[in-house]
Each structure stands twice: as C-alpha cells, then as structure tokens.
Amino acid sequence: THGIDNPFIEYRDSLSDQNTDKDKYTLVLANPPFKGSLDAESVSGDLLKVCKTKKTELLFLALFLRILKVGGRCACIVPDGVLFGSSTAHKAIRKEIVENQRLEAVISMPSGVFKPYAGVSTAILIFTKTEHGGTDDVWFYDMTADGFSLDDKRSPIADNDIPDIIERFRHLDKEADRKRTDKSFMVPKKDIVANDYDLSINKYKEVEYVAVEYPPTEEIMANIRELEMQIGTEMDELEKLLGL
C-alpha cells in the first residue's frame, strides 16, 4: 500500500463498464498490468472512443485521462512500445496526451528494472489533464541505473540515477539549456508533432562522437612488416628448440 494507512481497494475490472469513475482523482500513480489484448466487448465504450484498441497498455492511459479531474496529474509506467508504436491506436493516445492535455516528462528506464518478473524496457510518462492542451517543452531523461543490478538478482549497486532525476525534475527551469547529448534535455512540442508524436528518447537524443586520430597508412604498414619479421624470427627460434 506504499505507506497509505487506510487504502480503499476494490476488486474489479478497471477497464470494463464496472468502473464508472470519472473526473474523480487529483493524482494517479500507476504501474498497470500489461497482459496484452482484451476482448473488445468487455472494454468500456468511452475508453474505446479515445483509442480503439484491445491493448491494455493503451486503454489504461485512456482510463487515467477519464478518472482524473481537470488539473489532476498522472505518473504512470508504460512499456516502450507505447512511445513509438505505429498503429492508429498508439498514435491516437499519444496525440491525445500531447495535443489535448499537457505532457510534462518522459523518463526512459532500462530493461531489467522489473526483473526477475519482466525484462521489457519501460518509461514513466508524467502528464496533467487539462482538456485544452498546454504541452510546450517536454522533458526527457535517459535513466541507465536505479541502484540495483539489471539482472535477475537485482543486487544493490552504487550507480543510481533516481536522486538525479528527482533533483532535475524539481528544477526544470534549469534544463532548457542542456544539450541533447546530456542525460536529460527538453524537446519542444513542434519537434514531437513533426515526428508523428513519437516519444522514444532515441528519436531526439544526440550521440556525441569523439574523432579518433590514426597514424598515417605508411606508418601502419611499416609496423605490420616489422611485426611480421619479428614473428618470423621467433618462429625460426622455436623450430630450432623443437629440433624441426
């Protein structure tokens, strides 16, 4: 229950008509199950209006938008496919969040953070329900470590990006000047729209290549010949030792 003294928990299908919650919550923190596809007949009709799909990872995003009050915020974990999927439904839910709500951040997490249960790469989406847009610059962070090894053992390690993520997110006003080669950076909405609402960090992150200087070709060839001569000499000595 994550520190909540008196949690209210109901057993029901959140994506079906059993769940009538709407405009009810000011905050949604979620790591919903992504079990694949559902029977479309069991899905609430108003969710299908947002994105017509059977995929639970997309339907849950539509659900969070429905149950939030205007001004309410959501931080939810999604599989990477949500960020760049090319289906009509994938694009529809991303467009809904970017154009009609306010997308604030995309935190990319490495595969392994949910091992030994799942090895899929995931991300955290942070957005506010506005119903009138408001997305401006979206903050991206490339998380590579969470304080534990990324294998099935999940042993504690020194590398941990989480404190840095929290610190940078608290001071987004200082993020505007960061280059896209950094761990975090801002991406303007127009760039996201131009890329068909793709939210994968690799779409925008830039890799800084360091030029490697090599010796002149003549010098390399001379070194190769010298090594060949040395090998030949040592082979002769070895044959003498073996009496060949």
Describe each model-derived feature in a short phrase.
Residues 11, 16-244:
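A conserved structural/catalytic subdomain of Rossmann-like adenosyl-cofactor enzymes
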